[in-house]
């Protein structure tokens, strides 16, 4: 029996955010594509200026450290995830905690994670 589009949509609809994130990454790896929106062609001068000053940063949890419970609490507070999803994120490190945040927010998140005992970085 073949799988229909409706079967796929139902399965995707039942997934958590973390499961959907893993699914997207699996698609990117298997098919060599990117889920990022395609950028409209911009003038070369504007692109060079944008490359010089980065305005959006990603906070990446690289290791949970010894005090995993505190790290899970901080991840939950930063992301709004449920307990299971936050635990899965911490257990599956390295994982991106937040994407596209300002430099000040990224530094604040990094400080909270490191104070909880985690190892994290800003990309």
Curated annotation (Swiss-Prot):
Record-linked CDD domains: Ribosomal_L7_L12 (cd00387)
Gene Ontology annotations of biological process type: translation
Gene3D superfamilies: 3.30.1390.10, Single helix bin
GO molecular function, one term: mRNA binding
UniProt keywords, alphabetically: Ribonucleoprotein, Ribosomal protein
Top-level taxon of origin: Bacteria
Signal peptide: none
Pfam families referenced in this protein's UniProt entry, alphabetically: Ribosomal_L12, Ribosomal_L12_N
GO CC annotations on file: cytosolic large ribosomal subunit
Protein family according to the UniProt entry: Belongs to the bacterial ribosomal protein bL12 family.
Protein purpose: Forms part of the ribosomal stalk which helps the ribosome interact with GTP-bound translation factors. Is thus essential for accurate translation.
Listed HAMAP family: Ribosomal_bL12
PANTHER family (UniProt xref): 39S RIBOSOMAL PROTEIN L12, LARGE RIBOSOMAL SUBUNIT PROTEIN BL12M
Oligomer status and interactors: Homodimer. Part of the ribosomal stalk of the 50S ribosomal subunit. Forms a multimeric L10(L12)X complex, where L10 forms an elongated spine to which 2 to 4 L12 dimers bind in a sequential fashion. Binds GTP-bound translation factors.
Name listed for the protein in its UniProt record: Large ribosomal subunit protein bL12
Provenance organism: Laribacter hongkongensis (strain HLHK9)
Gene: rplL
């Amino acid at each position: 029996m073949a799988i229909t589009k409706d079967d796929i949509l139902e399965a995707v609809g039942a997934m958590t955010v973390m499961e959907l994130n893993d699914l997207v990454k699996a698609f990117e790896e298997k098919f060599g594509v990117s889920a990022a929106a395609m950028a409209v062609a911009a003038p070369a001068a504007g692109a060079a200026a944008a490359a010089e000053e980065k305005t959006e940063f990603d906070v990446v949890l690289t290791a949970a450290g010894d005090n995993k419970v505190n790290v899970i609490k901080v991840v939950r507070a930063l992301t709004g995830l449920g307990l299971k999803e936050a635990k899965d994120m911490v257990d599956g490190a390295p994982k991106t905690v937040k994407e596209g945040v300002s430099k000040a927010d990224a530094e604040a998140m990094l400080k909270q994670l490191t104070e909880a005992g985690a190892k994290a970085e800003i990309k």
